Amino acid sequence: MRQENDSLGIVEVPEDKLYGAQTARSQKYFSWAPEVMPKEVIRALVLIKQCAAKANHDLGFLDSKYCDMIVSAASEILEGGFEEHFPLKVWQTGSGTQSNMNVNEVIANLAIQRHGGVVGSKTPIHPNDHVNKSQSSNDVFPTAMHIAAVINLKKKLIPAMDHLQRALDAKVAEFRDCVKIGRTHLMDAVPMTLGQEFSGYSNQIRQSLERVAFSLTHMYELAIGGTAVGTGLNVPNGFIDKVIHYLRQETGEPFVAASNYFSALSNHDTLVNAHGVLATLACALTKIATDLSFLGSGPRCGLGELLFPENEPGSSIMPGKINPTQCEALQMVCAQVIGNNQAVIMGGSRGNFELNVMKPVIIYNFLQSVDILAGGMQAFADYFVSGLRVNKPRLKEYLDNSLMLVTALTPVLGYDKCSKMALKAFHDNINLKEACIQMGYLSAEEFDRLVVPESMVGKF
């Protein structure tokens, strides 16, 4: 162990770790849970430190030597391999201050180490005076939240959504001529094609994609420069433009300064709204996964309209059983995301005066939702949707036996006669054509001419 000092006194720090006193204190008091600060947030914090150093140097507030040391250390961390030096939990101060200081300390100590200095000496690089210069945890952490959210939505979630939509669209085309009976209220309805049914699923994903894209609009606004309460205290003129310029350069994303810094620090309505979009996507995916599970139920004693890909045995006791496991996994993902949404809402509601104090739990749940939705949709598309096949004999069986084909006769016979015909067919356990002939409404030839399921599927 080595000894370091902070404003409260001496702290023991593991000799082989690059973090310092404040991180060690946080570990002592907040080590009782497994959830660590997401690596995406740490990367965003490191990136902010790198860009802030460049901005401070450009404005003449940080010597070239110190800037180069900070930028070099940050670059090395961003390349990977330093995860053990960022051990702090999600459950910490609600401003994320401890993780901000964790990053400050690691960058400072790595820079010191690489230049032959003594780790923990704060010489020549100081975690507060140099790495955190022109910054506060209160503006840095929400900036990191937005950066991490934007990057993960665009690199993980949106590609996975697009992949699933394309898989569904392929089935729309493949099943376009497969006429089946639709269902409303879980009961038989009029004919449609299986392709039409899948087009509804595809459109749900398409609309969710549009909602996700729109939710990014305000997420590009960054709080950096607001410092402690949004007034920009201790921020030199030009710093905000400079640091955002470098963040745009490094990420390729169109980040801009917050339209109102008091809002950017005190609330996270933008992330609450965006996670609401993720919850909406989860609702859509639950509906799709549930429908497909039912459509393939059986295979002998269920609906059996779809045949599932045979990925793995489904039972430890019943041989030959194949279950819709990808559907079930996705449904569990969606349940978790909808639960996360409540946590994000609660976190967002805790904006006390000038600072929201549940920032870590908001971004933790947000990023978890993105990760599991992206992974779940990718697997669902690859291992389930793409392998679905249609059971055409079962579709024909249901078509031939459906009583709702009577709807095609209402323009000719009227609603009342058609109702009597359908009820007779049901109670006598005969098909619709037989009931129609027995009741003397139409001849067999007239019935066949008027009741053609393929002509009842509409134009869409």
From Swiss-Prot:
What is the top-level taxon of the source organism? Bacteria
Q: Where in the cell is it found?
A: Cytoplasm
Q: Which Pfam families match?
A: FumaraseC_C, Lyase_1
Q: Which reaction does it catalyse?
A: (S)-malate = fumarate + H2O
Signal sequence annotation:
none
- The UniProt annotation places substrate binding at 95-97, 126-129, 136-138, 184, 316, 321-323
Record-listed E.C. numbers: 4.2.1.2
Pathway(s) annotated for this protein in UniProt: Carbohydrate metabolism; tricarboxylic acid cycle; (S)-malate from fumarate: step 1/1
- List, alphabetically, the GO terms of the cellular component aspect: cytoplasm
The entry lists its GO molecular-function terms as:
fumarate hydratase activity
Q: Which PROSITE patterns match?
A: FUMARATE_LYASES
Query: Which GO biological process categories is it annotated with?
Result: fumarate metabolic process; malate metabolic process; tricarboxylic acid cycle
Keywords from the named record: Cytoplasm, Lyase, Tricarboxylic acid cycle
Where in the chain is the site Important for catalytic activity?
A: 328
Coiled-coil residue windows:
none
Specify where it is mainly localized: cytoplasm
Q: Which residues form the active site?
A: 185, 315
Top-rank EC class of the record's enzyme: lyase
Job of this protein: Involved in the TCA cycle. Catalyzes the stereospecific interconversion of fumarate to L-malate.
| Subunit annotation | Homotetramer.
Q: Which family does it belong to?
A: Belongs to the class-II fumarase/aspartase family. Fumarase subfamily.
List other remarks: There are 2 substrate-binding sites: the catalytic A site, and the non-catalytic B site that may play a role in the transfer of substrate or product between the active site and the solvent. Alternatively, the B site may bind allosteric effectors.
This chain's protein is named Fumarate hydratase class II
